[in-house]
Amino acid sequence: MSALTRRHFLSTLTLAPAVVLGSGREAQAQTRLRVLLNSDFSSVNTWFTLADDRGFFRDAGLTLDYTAGRGAYTAAGRAAAEGFDVAYGDVNALVEEVARANAQAPVAVYMMFNRSPSVIAVPAGSPIRTPADLAGRHVRGHATDVALQTFPVLAAAHRLDASRVRITTSEAGMGALVTGMLAGECDGTFGYDSTITAALLTAGVPVERVRFLPYATLTPDLYGSALMVSRRLAREQPAVVHALVRAVNRGVAAVAADAGAALAATKRRVPAMHEPAERARLEHTLRGDMGHPEGRRLGIGAVDDARFARGLAALCRAKALPRVPAAADVFDAAFAVPAADRIASLAGA
């Protein structure tokens, strides 16, 4: 129920008051939470907006005040520095915060992306077919892009000397980065599969003009975006965290069941959104980033403990972080919804 301002998402509807009237009975107190999103409102965080529109957070006794994010990799650090109750963003950035012993780092409580969404896009006719082919090439991306930030893991996994890859950063939009690559400005572009696909559609460029080197297969132990909460909230108000996780899970189930309703929820907040691009972006997210086969066994929200531990250890080694934290220090499974309530329908082969 929230719309974008320059700094904050405040409600397109009136924000719920501190006390909301029940259905003819006693008033229900609402807990207000400050939430940092991965970006502005889009199809890839629409489980929040659809959950708001359908009253899932209200039913859980919660009112969410949203703040626009600056990219998934910045969410964990900003949540720690700015005191957010809740954040949604990349779990690998959270690993970095915990590995550096940041006492204010949040903790993940619901794993949204059970695959890494990151890719390196290259022109369809490029000779780059494997990570080894990146040696001597120029790859460009946003400084805080998840693919760029986790590239050391990919390089280490494939014994590629990362220093042999020329990496530059740019503040240009993703559409400009990819079309610039196609014009010969660089050999590859860091990004998400879904984001690059949406950028191409928005720019009117055939998606077939690019190919992807997908981290999901090249660094299979890495996870992606997760719901995080402050450690103080988890410690002092665990019932609130349980309620939040249940409501978000209901939102994910609603999005998976009705993508059209999810896109409509986004459009109500971003009337100028490019609908075909956002539809493709959501489809890539649901079937790709949330489609790991383990989802059939675990459902969305949970992690495979051994895989998660391998992935965070690989990240810490590749980025020479001060320590390798225990998986439980990064992801707290105590707040998981019951297995029977988790969404397993997105799992791929």
Where are these regions (language model features)?
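N-terminal secretory signal peptides and thylakoid transit peptides that target proteins
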Residues: 1-17
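Cleavable N-terminal signal peptides
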Residues: 16, 26-27
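N-terminal signal peptide c-region/cleavage motif recognized by signal peptidases
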Residues: 22-24
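Short, glycine-/small- and polar/acidic-enriched structural segments
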Residues: 29-183, 187-194, 213-215, 220-221
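Short glycine- and hydrophobic/aromatic-rich loop-to-beta-strand nucleating segment
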Residues: 119-121, 226-229, 233
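Extracytoplasmic/periplasmic substrate-binding proteins
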Residues: 197-216
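Secondary-structure end/capping motifs
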Residues: 236-318
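Conserved C-terminal helix/tail region of periplasmic/extracytoplasmic solute-binding proteins
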Residues: 308-349
